[in-house]
């Protein structure tokens, strides 16, 4: 017997604004039941003597200094552009066109 019912799946689908065909509700209920069972098994194993972690390996962020470095001049940036107009990249218009 599923821990989650067909009606609960339909309710969740409505909350998520998903249109689910009636014939998929039983299948999804069974799949969600498998997922819920797997999570329950993990909860059984993860008792209070095991500290919670967000990652299996202890990782720390390595930051580099935020230093200003020379970049391209506007002329260098536009040098290889296929089209330039008024000191800017010229690109085809895409908004407002009928497609």
Swiss-Prot record:
The EC number on file is 6.3.5.-
InterPro entries in the cross-refs: Asp/Glu-ADT_sf_sub_c, GatC
Q: What NCBIfam families does the entry give?
A: gatC
> What assembly does the database describe for this protein?
Heterotrimer of A, B and C subunits.
| Function noted in UniProt | Allows the formation of correctly charged Asn-tRNA(Asn) or Gln-tRNA(Gln) through the transamidation of misacylated Asp-tRNA(Asn) or Glu-tRNA(Gln) in organisms which lack either or both of asparaginyl-tRNA or glutaminyl-tRNA synthetases. The reaction takes place in the presence of glutamine and ATP through an activated phospho-Asp-tRNA(Asn) or phospho-Glu-tRNA(Gln).
Would you kindly state one Gene Ontology biological process term found in this protein's UniProt entry?
glutaminyl-tRNAGln biosynthesis via transamidation
Which reaction is this enzyme known to catalyze?
A: L-glutamyl-tRNA(Gln) + L-glutamine + ATP + H2O = L-glutaminyl-tRNA(Gln) + L-glutamate + ADP + phosphate + H(+); L-aspartyl-tRNA(Asn) + L-glutamine + ATP + H2O = L-asparaginyl-tRNA(Asn) + L-glutamate + ADP + phosphate + 2 H(+)
Family of the protein in this entry: Belongs to the GatC family.
Q: Which HAMAP family match?
A: GatC
The question of whether ATP-binding is a record keyword is answered with: yes
The species this protein belongs to is Thermobifida fusca (strain YX)
Question: Gene3D superfamilies from the entry?
Answer: Glu-tRNAGln amidotransferase C subunit, N-terminal domain (1.10.20.60)
User: Mind listing the UniProt keywords for this protein, alphabetically?
Assistant: ATP-binding, Ligase, Nucleotide-binding, Protein biosynthesis
The protein, known as: Aspartyl/glutamyl-tRNA(Asn/Gln) amidotransferase subunit C
Question: What Gene Ontology terms describe what this protein does at the molecular function level?
Answer: asparaginyl-tRNA synthase (glutamine-hydrolyzing) activity; ATP binding; glutaminyl-tRNA synthase (glutamine-hydrolyzing) activity
- Reading the lineage from the top rank, the first entry is Bacteria
